[in-house]
């Protein structure tokens, strides 16, 4: 299986459906197996399991669970739908089209024909209850709207920021919000300091423990105690030294991985995330070009600048691939220009992943 197939043609779309079904099929079977092994009645599944559907890619877990419960576990269709609807919840991360998948029914029939009768049943139930075309599961063009399955047959729908959730409720998913206002809620995205502090920055974690105690490891709000030391120069100097140590480690890591020598005393401007037009890496690139021209014109920055990018782009996303190419060409020009490189460097890290993120972030 290719991790990121080119889905610009039918073969790529079919492969993506294969991938999605492969994952949810295995996951669904494992979940039900573990619940049964613990001696629980599958009719009580929602009491023991919560399945979070992140964007629409795992949506087929809903009809797959219904299929297993009805064909292998003796459930009626009504019982299976009820249990699954109280087990699955949907998170919408973005309103971009690629996160709201719409698969031709014919494609699903080619890959997982066993799910088609169930999807049609779910669609028919919605169509009998609601006449609005905008909330149908199978539309007039015979496309299956995966997000619509999640919303109709899940117990919760959440966005990942307050403004995002309001957009879902008032605009993008307003037709559903009018039907199921009680399902919509917000869960603001965040980070776990246990990963990005305790695991990735042992020096800073040890210093915090020494300065404010270790209560913050279980209660993040205790990090606010650090504000009591905001005017303590010794504390500020210690944090600065730790930051410099970590920057030096990152410089060494990038030198080893990318072969680029960076200045640890420069300002690090880091943008690491999936490459997409709306993430605006191209805007950052234009700024770097502007700074390059300024330096060439004699306007040197008081502190050297280092720009670090890390990203992946879908194989069929031509513009995103072009932006990566642009950044690579720019890095070659900037880093090899003796007039500019002492004041500015650019590196596009290869194979950006969690291990790299732990160093960069």
What residue spans do the PLM features occupy?
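A conserved ligand/cofactor-binding region detector
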Residues: 1-361
